[in-house]
Amino acid sequence: MSNSQANAGISGSTVADEPIQHHPSLAAGPVSASCPAATPPSQSTQQPPPHIVSASTADAGSSAAVGVGVVAGSEGVNLDSSPRESGDDSEDESEILEESPCGRWLKRREEVDQRDVPGIDCVHLAMDTEEGVEVVWNEVQYASLQELKSQEEKMRQVFDNLLQLDHQNIVKFHRYWTDTQQAERPRVVFITEYMSSGSLKQFLKRTKRNAKRLPLESWRRWCTQILSALSYLHSCSPPIIHGNLTCDSIFIQHNGLVKIGSVVPDAVHYSVRRGRERERERERGAHYFQAPEYGAADQLTAALDIYAFGMCALEMAALEIQPSNSESTAINEETIQRTIFSLENDLQRDLIRKCLNPQPQDRPSANDLLFHPLLFEVHSLKLLTAHCLVFSPANRTMFSETAFDGLMQRYYQPDVVMAQLRLAGGQERQYRLADVSGADKLEKFVEDVKYGVYPLITYSGKKPPNFRSRAASPERADSVKSATPEPVDTESRRIVNMMCSVKIKEDSNDITMTILLRMDDKMNRQLTCQVNENDTAADLTSELVRLGFVHLDDQDKIQVLLEETLKAGVMSDGAGAESSGAGVTTTATMAALEQLERNWSISSDADKQGTAVMYVPQEQQNADGDVDVEHSGTTSN
């Protein structure tokens, strides 16, 4: 395909990712290929939005949302009262102030309380028009264009690396760009996942108000998730250092899922003003999460994060670190040691002391801490089975999300026989699901495993990316809305089901190809482009991968689908029937496409309206030669 054809073809195609079970009003509209779909937020983060007040009227009772490196949570939060007192106020907060250069992100007037996170100047709630969900619009403002230029390369490196992160315990980073429209106030804007359930600091304050002690099991589960995220960051090449880990920058969901932000503040923005703020923080004792060597070291190291984690673990265990006396708010070494001594569990004290070792070279790594006697455990067969069920590649590709949920419901009934025991007298005894204690919580347990509440720490986790420099510069917005395209991302989601159709227009004989993709996160994607007799399936597929619409590992599978569609609709006798406008549709499931190297059979059925082609592995055909629709999918014109 020529460049001109590419521009008029897939690069100009209609793209829509929309949730299957969302309200139609939330369905995504068409989006230009210049702003490719980013990985949608995990299902666990799409909670009911909190009550948020404008920053101009925010007080100690306001709740918060967060992006990467943006702290959510303020003291005395009241989750039961709404600060919105009238419909007019709500309409004002929903007013759109500006949009991203690609038009996908819409910044609202509604601001989010960010507390004292270094480097972040302004945080607004925003709408992702493609996914139909709320996100966070973060702004870092620079004193001058010269200052931005001096930090741009370092900023680019950090943000380019953050775009590649994919961990269920790390707040998702979606996009960034620079804006130099106002030379006297240049800025960097980045879009992050919206966390609505508040910070860990908020939760600890509420727990302390209720005079409750945090159970050791909850403490262990939180520490495991935080260390899993830190181990992932530190295992990147080069390593990513958090640099601002506190209980204010750790966020907890309603189901116990913990996430941390991942921006290094000094790499985002550093100026004289930031230095003065840091000195004020030291004066009021807010620096106690920072290691003794912080500021003196030439380069941030993983040991800094380990020290900060130790302070977080101590605050989680004690609920609060009280100052030495009521007249001072400073937290010193004596206060820390007294708080550690107040803990009852010896192993808990040992783990925290190792993290707070004054010598950075003697502190354990995040991975080493996962094997500490207090955190390490031999995973139960129940947990291993749940991970196999949820994350096994075979299970993720064999069924769509809906089919998988239906399969779970089929076997999750009280009268389902789980085991059968033959007794000595020849009698048989059946054990049903209703006989198992805690069976009513099994479905929730599997859901928690899916969302990352129970990671496997004794096995190698998800391999972090090896970062490389990007050839493209970050997007620079010269106006509120610019035609400059953003850097194209690679698609990280896999295809579960796919369908392709071609249709010839009666008046012009132009061939329109439409590709429907169902991704592994319940999202549908529709791609439409014009093709001609010179276009090949290989060229079309390569362009889909290059533009970030298809995962690289799915390239061969979708190429076969396109080849069969073009063959059936254009090169065969069925092309004549196409002129009637009926079209040709080809459908394939990932389960079938995964077996390309095996023995295939292609079932074709042509009628007067058009032709339909479906891929079906032989083992999925029954004795009569019919297709098991539940496994292979359906075909329609």
From Swiss-Prot:
**What does the UniProt entry state concerning the protein's domains?**
The protein kinase domain is predicted to be catalytically inactive.
**Its domain of life?**
Eukaryota
Instruction: Give a short account of what the protein does.
Output: May play a role in subcellular trafficking between the endoplasmic reticulum and Golgi apparatus.
Q: Name one GO molecular function term.
A: protein homodimerization activity
Start-end of Polar residues biased regions: 1-14
Q: Could you confirm whether the keyword Zinc appears in this record? A: no
Keywords noted in UniProt: Cytoplasm, Phosphoprotein
- One Gene Ontology cellular component annotation held by this UniProt entry: endomembrane system
Subcellular location per UniProt equals: Cytoplasm, Cell cortex
Its main subcellular localisation, reduced to a broad class, is cytoplasm
According to the record, the residues making up region (Disordered) are: 1-60, 74-99, 465-489, 617-637
A Gene Ontology biological process in which this protein takes part is:
intracellular signal transduction
One short Pfam name that applies is PK_Tyr_Ser-Thr
Q: Where is the Protein kinase domain?
A: 109-375
Biased-composition ranges for Acidic residues? 88-98
Q: What is this protein called?
A: Nuclear receptor-binding protein homolog
**InterPro entries noted in UniProt:** Kinase-like_dom_sf, Prot_kinase_dom, Ser-Thr/Tyr_kinase_cat_dom, WNK_Ser-Thr_kinase
Q: Does the keyword Cytoplasm apply?
A: yes
Q: Where is the composition biased (Low complexity)?
A: 36-46
User: At what positions is Phosphothreonine found?
Assistant: T484
| Residues modified to Phosphoserine | S473, S479, S482
